[in-house]
UniProtKB/Swiss-Prot annotation:
Keywords: FAD, Flavoprotein, Monooxygenase, NAD, NADP, Oxidoreductase, Purine metabolism. This is FAD-dependent urate hydroxylase. FAD cannot be replaced by FMN or riboflavin. It catalyses: urate + NADH + O2 + H(+) = 5-hydroxyisourate + NAD(+) + H2O; urate + NADPH + O2 + H(+) = 5-hydroxyisourate + NADP(+) + H2O.
Amino acid sequence: MSLAQLEHALQHDLQRLAHGGEPWVRPRVHPAGHVYDVVIVGAGQSGLGAAFALQRERVHNVLVIDENPPGQEGPWVTYARMQTLRTPKQITSIDLGVPTLTFRAWWEAQHGAAGWDALDKIPRGTWMDYLRWYRAALRLPVRNATQLVRIEPDAAPGIHRLHLAMGAPLMARKIILATGIQGGGQWQVPEWITQALPAQRYAHTSGPIDYAALAGKRVGILGGGASAFDNACFALDQGVARAEVFVRRAALPRVNPIRHMEQAGIIPRFAALPDADKYRMMASFFGRNQPPTNDTFQRACAHAGFALHLDAPWLGVEEHNDVVVVRTPQGEHRFDFLAIATGLVTDPRLRPELAALSGRIACWADRYQAPPGQANPVLDAHPYLGPGFELLPRTPDDAAAVDGLFAFNYSALINHGLSAAALSGLKVALPRLARAVADQLFLDDRQAMVEAYLGYDQAEFVGQWPQPTQAVA
């Protein structure tokens, strides 16, 4: 089967499923222009999947926006530097149960069943190619080069304005923030590094780093997670002379809790847990860290320029004689550049697009008090979400301003587990999100919906009794 044949089969499958259909949502009229029922911010895998899931709910007045050029959405061809995805190849996600929309179907259309059997893990760039195909095959409404700056409530009830970096604001009844891992906060470089070094001497691994320009140079990498080793391998492949990873712990993590969550039924049912159980499990999740994949670690070790320093927290950094000096308990180390793989901080107050609303958004600290000795400020700063990923108000007075906003990004982790920004969870998370958005749209107009039902009188049955006398031939 070719890709063209696969796309034909996909359209046939969608017809069999009665995909789409006539819209039922009542349109809003606004003097300033068109009002979208839903605007999805972010055209990566979560945003595209959300648009498809809404189509399944017959919600069609939807726009997906992304600040990046077409085909550059998400991390896969920007700052992600692993060779392959860490997620097992057989896990389904944004296909929503349509076999001809799966990555496997797309791969086999090009490489056959034997090619699937030969595939170990999904190459990073190949996954991005699949997302490009997915968007085109489903004809999803995406507007690129569109950067959201600020969200604020409109004077008209139930409508939000999305102010953009360029162009007129958009108006929407519902907004889905499908903004990935960093979408609920920001990547963080420790302040003691930013204050000690000029900006050209360091970068967070989530941002652009021209490792090719550092060929022949020495790079120090702070962090013990998978991304630290991804960057070490990538840097060495680009010609860096030395890539040394520094880990605070005395040993690398060996257990990947995600694998257990995938196998034990936790991912689809995490949201049903009581808050106390969610809090305990996520505190453990943050404490464990995700180990590098075995193949990535072995690739790093195979490079002569690689070194790993365990039990080696950075005590300080400084620039001296055109060299960056890093102090650890093991001594001083000299580098030309530092790559910081220390993760991110999740807190809606850090998001510029939510600046007008952040003080009105409920966080875990507002809704749950951990037992003595278990409180975790990292968890407490996460937004406290409803069952459909909706942001909730801190106080009743904040309800109108926050209503209609959905955090379908990594900040949903504490309430929903691996869901919105994890391939392992999208299979379950996307239908839950789409139903919640559709329910809100329906309930917003419930009075009109009920009255329309009560007044419905279109005749369907046209039979007569007694039957009219038939003319004799």
